[in-house]
């Protein structure tokens, strides 16, 4: 079939799938399929830096708030997938990072989280895979931020004990604070250059989340709870999205630069229009939480 040289696939905006077989220590390709990928340079503002945030569906919950807070400040990207467990990160991180060594495709800052999908992982496997992901992230030379995993609320089953091989307890109360987050932070302590955005602490301590934290969740799959589940949709995603945005600007040395306005209007904050988990909203306190850099920075590690 001939050989493809590097010049055949520049600029690097294609994903390659290679089929073939190993013969000794040599892989012989019989077919190479190239899938066109979005050329981010065509939509980037060249005057702005580039930010990649990696996370599961929880990151999707705060996606809008994060992007709104950083509007006009950075070109923002998320892999086109639910990033799921850390094992998925190990298998896909090179693809998610893209051709960061090419002009205009480098990353200035990357935030990452793996946790909810690892709620039944073992300590050794979780930490080992985190180290593998971090090794790839460091190659980018970007500023790195680890985002702690948000709590599992009180409507889920009560806490359990570690299983064989230090296996975490699954999606039950306190799994994140007892196991997953401490395991992750133990890894991060080996990499002091990685900043921490403690979303778990913010949610656990701010009164806005009190009803959700106490009542959301279910004991059996399929149960309906008006207070929702472990996802932080709607207004629940606003504070943590802005908390992460504040951290992103801070690690870039832009501590004095304000976040962009949150864009919420009176109807969005009207207690009569809230879902069960946010019906007791204190509008003044909530607005202050969104707008106060001091409060957004409060939960530092």
Where are these regions (language model features)?
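Helix-enriched interaction subdomains in cytosolic or periplasmic regions
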Residues: 2-24
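A cross-family glycoside hydrolase active-site/sugar-binding cleft signature
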Residues: 113, 147-149, 200
